[in-house]
């Protein structure tokens, strides 16, 4: 069994040992603090059916907590919108912010287990960067994660995954994610 004090996630160790040096050489950084690294990963689940049944938000939060490995926060409406039948403070979805070891563990599971299980998967879009080194992607089915028991799921939910890096440009961020074996299609 692994000792908690000495355990390091696989991708974190890979970053320290090989990726950091490769990025420093590729972009010619003079200082180690200039090298881009992962800052956080935000998982967001907007549950459209929450307007009719608020229990679905709780169920979505439980499933997101299983996927992330930490408790999900329920997000609420900031203001009322009559056209969508939304009232202020009404629960609409849930989110989780991952940092540290859990972030690296989630990214490892996403790249190596979840994405290959997506139907008709041909790689993630290489153009989904925001101009400041952050990458956003969506999944239509949360059941691709091994933590979710398909038999106990009432409804298949989609989710947004935002990978925030300290990179200043999209090219730096793409190079960082490619080093982590993110399967870009372009």
Curated annotation (Swiss-Prot):
Looking up Gene3D superfamilies in the UniProt record yields: 3.30.1440.10
Task: List residues traversing the bilayer.
Answer: none
Relate the assembly described in the record.
Answer: Part of the 50S ribosomal subunit; part of the 5S rRNA/L5/L18/L25 subcomplex. Contacts the 5S rRNA and the P site tRNA. Forms a bridge to the 30S subunit in the 70S ribosome.
Report which superkingdom the organism of origin falls in: Bacteria
Disulfides per UniProt:
none
- Which family is annotated? Belongs to the universal ribosomal protein uL5 family.
Its lineage opens with: Bacteria, Pseudomonadati, Pseudomonadota, Alphaproteobacteria, Rhodobacterales
What role does this protein play?
A: This is one of the proteins that bind and probably mediate the attachment of the 5S RNA into the large ribosomal subunit, where it forms part of the central protuberance. In the 70S ribosome it contacts protein S13 of the 30S subunit (bridge B1b), connecting the 2 subunits; this bridge is implicated in subunit movement. Contacts the P site tRNA; the 5S rRNA and some of its associated proteins might help stabilize positioning of ribosome-bound tRNAs.
Name of protein = Large ribosomal subunit protein uL5
Choose any GO biological process term that the UniProt entry carries and state it: translation
Residues annotated as coiled-coil are none
Q: Which GO terms describe its molecular function?
A: rRNA binding; structural constituent of ribosome; tRNA binding
Q: Which PANTHER family match?
A: 60S RIBOSOMAL PROTEIN L11-RELATED (PTHR11994)
Keywords (alphabetical) are: Ribonucleoprotein, Ribosomal protein, RNA-binding, rRNA-binding, tRNA-binding
Cellular component per GO, a single term: ribosome
């Amino acid at each position: 069994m692994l000792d908690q004090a000495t355990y390091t996630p696989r991708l974190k160790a890979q970053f320290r040992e090989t990726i950091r040096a490769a990025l420093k050489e590729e972009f010619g950084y003079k200082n180690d603090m200039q090298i881009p690294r992962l800052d956080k990963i935000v998982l967001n689940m907007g549950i459209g059916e929450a307007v009719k049944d608020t229990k679905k938000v709780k169920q979505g939060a439980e499933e997101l907590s299983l996927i992330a490995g930490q408790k999900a926060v329920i997000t609420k409406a900031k203001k009322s919108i009559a056209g969508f039948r939304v009232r202020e403070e009404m629960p609409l979805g849930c989110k989780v912010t991952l940092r540290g070891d859990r972030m690296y563990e989630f990214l490892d599971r996403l790249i190596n287990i979840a994405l290959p299980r997506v139907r008709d998967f041909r790689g993630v879009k290489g153009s989904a960067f925001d101009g400041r080194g952050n990458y956003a992607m969506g999944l239509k089915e949360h059941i691709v994660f091994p933590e979710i028991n398909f038999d106990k799921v009432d409804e298949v939910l989609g989710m947004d995954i935002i990978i925030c890096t300290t990179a200043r440009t999209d090219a730096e961020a793409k190079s960082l994610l490619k080093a982590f074996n993110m399967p870009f299609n372009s």
